[in-house]
């Protein structure tokens, strides 16, 4: 199935918070803070039809309170507004 966001929206695969620290300590779900990072799966366009400045597989940090979750083939994805994308993460 191919999902293409409409308008200034971005489809992300949510990056989950680690369940175990690097030192091997388990972190219960109640103590984990939600990590607002994701990998871009698909992007919409600006109202004038121009491409959003993101591409598939970009690692992004997002903010805001509005995100719609969907499930495709047992994988969870979220739609966020482009205005809520705060930064891209570049590995050095």
From Swiss-Prot:
Statement: the UniProt record of this protein carries the keyword Transmembrane: no
Cysteines joined through disulfide linkages: none
GO biological process: chaperone cofactor-dependent protein refolding
SMART domains referenced in this protein's UniProt entry, alphabetically: Cpn10
Keywords: Chaperone, Cytoplasm
GO CC annotations, alphabetized: cytoplasm
Name of one Pfam family that matches: Cpn10
Gene Ontology terms, MF aspect: ATP binding; metal ion binding; protein folding chaperone; protein-folding chaperone binding; unfolded protein binding
Keyword Cytoplasm: yes
Subcellular location: Cytoplasm
InterPro entries: Chaperonin_GroES, Chaperonin_GroES_sf, Chaprnonin_Cpn10_CS, GroES-like_sf
Coarse class of the protein's main subcellular location: cytoplasm
Classification via CDD domains: cpn10 (cd00320)
Family statement drawn from the similarity comment of this UniProt entry: Belongs to the GroES chaperonin family.
Function: Together with the chaperonin GroEL, plays an essential role in assisting protein folding. The GroEL-GroES system forms a nano-cage that allows encapsulation of the non-native substrate proteins and provides a physical environment optimized to promote and accelerate protein folding. GroES binds to the apical surface of the GroEL ring, thereby capping the opening of the GroEL channel.
UniProt cross-references to PANTHER family, sorted A to Z: 10 KDA HEAT SHOCK PROTEIN, 20 KDA CHAPERONIN, CHLOROPLASTIC
Quaternary structure and partners: Heptamer of 7 subunits arranged in a ring. Interacts with the chaperonin GroEL.
Protein name: Co-chaperonin GroES
Naturally occurring in which organism (per UniProt): Methanosarcina mazei (strain ATCC BAA-159 / DSM 3647 / Goe1 / Go1 / JCM 11833 / OCM 88) (Methanosarcina frisia)
Lineage: Archaea, Methanobacteriati, Methanobacteriota, Stenosarchaea group, Methanomicrobia
């Amino acid at each position: 199935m191919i999902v293409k966001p409409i308008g200034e929206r971005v489809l992300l695969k949510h990056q989950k918070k680690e369940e175990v620290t690097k030192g091997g300590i388990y972190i219960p779900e109640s103590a984990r803070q939600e990590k607002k990072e994701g990998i871009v799966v698909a992007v919409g366009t600006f109202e004038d039809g121009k491409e959003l400045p993101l591409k598939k597989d970009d690692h992004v940090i997002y903010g805001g309170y509005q995100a719609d979750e969907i499930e495709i083939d047992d994988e969870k994805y979220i739609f966020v507004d482009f205005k809520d994308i705060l930064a891209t993460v570049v590995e050095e």
